[in-house]
A protein has these predicted regions:
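Surface-exposed interaction/gating patches
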Residues: 1-17, 98-103
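Short amphipathic alpha-helical segments
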Residues: 14-38
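Short, structured motif recognition centered on aromatic/hydrophobic residues
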Residues: 2-6, 18, 30, 49-54
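Short amphipathic alpha-helices within nucleic acid-binding modules
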Residues: 16-20, 58-70
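Residues within well-ordered alpha-helical secondary structure of globular protein domains
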Residues: 21-24, 68, 81-84
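Glycine-rich beta-strand-turn "strand-cap" elements at beta-sheet edges
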Residues: 11, 32-51, 57, 74-103
Length: 103
């Protein structure tokens, strides 16, 4: 397995609105292509940030799933709704350590 930690920093004061919008509109779409491990709201460091961790079998699976997601008309319609909330976006890929409960 490979994990993608995707962090979205949103406009100040818009985090709650962003999360509601993402949960109701974005999550049902992207969940067809990726497995959500968890979603967290940062309470320290870079504030107004939400962290999602997504699981994929490997990089090839992630590439394939993201390509399918990008072809989904519902996702294409969702992106313009999401973009005004964003200040910064970052993706980090992680492999579990041998002793990690998440494999």
């Amino acid at each position: 397995m490979i994990y993608e930690m995707r962090t979205y920093q949103v406009q100040p004061g818009k985090a709650g609105e962003f999360l509601k919008m993402y949960q109701s509109k974005g999550l049902p779409i992207i969940s067809r292509y990726a497995k959500l491990i968890g979603c967290w709201v940062k309470e320290s460091g870079v504030l107004n940030s939400t962290v999602f961790i997504w699981a994929y079998e490997d990089f090839a699976h992630r590439t394939s799933q993201r390509a399918q997601l990008m072809q989904d008309p519902a996702w294409s319609a969702f992106i313009p709704e999401m973009l005004p909330y964003l200040v910064h976006q970052e993706s980090v890929f992680m492999n579990p350590a041998a002793f990690s409960p998440a494999k």
